[in-house]
Amino acid sequence: NNFPSKIIEGDNLDINIINNTDYFLKVYMNNQLLTEGTDYQYINNNLVVTNINGDIKIYFKMPICQRATVLHTEECKGNYCNGIGYKPGGAMGSSTITYGSLGTTGELKSGDAFDCDVNGDGIYDPETERFYYVKDLENNDNIAVLIYYNNVSNGTPSNDTYYQYYTIAENWHGPLNAMSQLPTTAQWKNVKLSQTSRKLVNEYGTTSSKDGHSYPETLDYSNYAARLLTMAEVKKLTTAYIPSWKNGELDAHLYLVENTNFSKKDNSKFDGYWLETPRNTMSNHGWIIYATARRVHSVEVQRTDVLVGVRPVIEVSKNDISY
């Protein structure tokens, strides 16, 4: 109530703001985050911002996700990325792969890059808290689905650890082994799933395999702050039929293959990360994002000789996203 509606450029802002909830105070001027102690002082509930030269925004309850200001890049060092033009003189103009987009204010499009304070420390780390908007949650367009930039092991970023979907050749149990590597609610305490009990369905949206094995009524994600991406969500990214079994069906969504062998080297093994979705026609297969081929594929769920990891997906209310 004591915040002035206008202030003359060059003046100082000096107001009392009581923080009873122990939120992190964040002050922005002209949409740039100011540094406490340098750009402003906040001592004993008194906020002082000197030399005002633009619009001021003050947050106690910060958005969980805010737009990235710098995009992640990787250098193409293998035939897969080279083959689609990431090389000097190639179709992409250089050997540098840029992941995602900075987007347009007020709009959300697949691949828009965000930094999300998932651990609740008040810091938006562009290196380890990078996410990409995929789509709105099915049946709830107030919630955004965002995918992490990296695979994880025990909830922390890891490029070179791989896990089975399930430990034996039976996909009808669900991805219980892969799920166990997702960030827990203690690790990513600032985000939560809209539903922690999820219905497991195959690529056709049905609840059993072609040979009659029923999937569990619910997958219990109650210990986890994130989940796996689904085949249904991938299908919504393109107007073409998926799976097409053709390389490059996801070339318009390369943010899905950041930090995989797509950019790094030649590799004859399947690589990428698991989707939540079991395959209907093969009850020992689960679907994956096949990263080097930029498409979906299916792999035996129990295999340990494939480079298939776990990549978290978070669900965030659009009210908690600055876009």
Where are these regions (language model features)?
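Surface-exposed interfaces of beta-sheet-rich extracellular modules
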Residues: D11-N45, Y133
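Conserved "repeat-terminator" motif of extracellular CCP/Sushi domains
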Residues: Q41-Q66
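Conserved N-terminal submotifs of small, disulfide-stabilized extracellular modules
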Residues: N1-E9, P63-Q66
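Collagenous Gly-X-Y triple-helix signature in extracellular proteins
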Residues: Q66-E75, N79-Y323
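Short, exposed beta-strand/loop patches in secreted or surface proteins that constitute
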Residues: S5-K6, T38-Y42, T105-G106, Y133-D136
